[in-house]
Amino acid sequence: MQNLQPFHTFHIQSNAREIIEAHSIEQLQQVWANSKSENLPTLFLGQGSNVLFLDDFNGIVILNRLMGITHEQDANFHYLHVNGGENWHKLVEWSINNGIYGLENLALIPGCAGSAPIQNIGAYGVEFKDVCDYVEVLNLNTNETFRLDTEQCEFGYRESIFKHRYQQGYVITAVGLKLKKDWQPILKYGSLVEFDPKTVTAKQIFDEVCHIRQSKLPDPNEVGNAGSFFKNPVVSSEHFEEIKKHHENLPHFPQADGSVKLAAGWLIDQCNLKGFQIGGAAVHKKQALVLINKNGATGQDVVKLAHHVRQTVAEKFGVYLQPEVRFISATGEVNSEQIIT
């Protein structure tokens, strides 16, 4: 068995039968074919920034290391073709340095470009779907590569077709991004609202987003974590009004369909759970939405903690939180919500 601890940001002690870096599509295909012939489960990882290992993984972990960025443009748009193994934050940094704007709100989101569409990553008013032109996918059973446009990806809040139809036997090899030359700043959230839209630069937004994230989110290199552990729940307007009767200052974000998105971190914080610990896992003291590997936590410690948080929030607010993090068992991905229920 090989140690998985360095390859995921929770840094929980777990092993895999084998860990292989794939630097080309041919290598991806070869490793996949070998694992199939041996009847072993396979797991594709980018930087492991959104996974929790519950046990040792009884199969082959393939690390996506497909690198390279190409840039084309026309009168109105910049087009980036980004291979799946590229670090997301470094891509954002590269784009700003090259005068290509539109990704700055997504700075410092951990992980690889190839993982961005799976979760439809988002922050500070921008989601991956807003900048996506296409996603390039390899069907490992037929070795054919195909592209899905934004609509075909079925993006939703932390949701996409890559969690469903294209989860097994497919790997994202590249993403295509389409960024307007007529750049408009997105200043809807947090301290970004204080900027003047007429004078603000993309670099200022980038710096501010980095500052906010670094001030409230623990660095995974110092404290194991997978960022936001839970999704922000979406409730009916009736349910929202009911909660608001007792909590006037409830942060909320009305949705286009009339439902209301709530801040999961605020709900957890209201239950006085910051710093709460089970085994080696704890709720982060600064940002309640983040569960941390405080002291040699096991996957089961994190599961027990997540269960406790979910139950406590449900008892107080009647809202059941869903994990944003993907849970990996000995044989592959499992339903995270079922595990913590």
From Swiss-Prot:
It catalyses: UDP-N-acetyl-alpha-D-muramate + NADP(+) = UDP-N-acetyl-3-O-(1-carboxyvinyl)-alpha-D-glucosamine + NADPH + H(+). Its EC number is 1.3.1.98. The keyword Heme does not apply. GO terms for cellular component: cytosol. The active site is at R158, S228, E324. NCBIfam families: murB, PRK00046.1, PRK13903.1. This is UDP-N-acetylenolpyruvoylglucosamine reductase. The gene is murB.
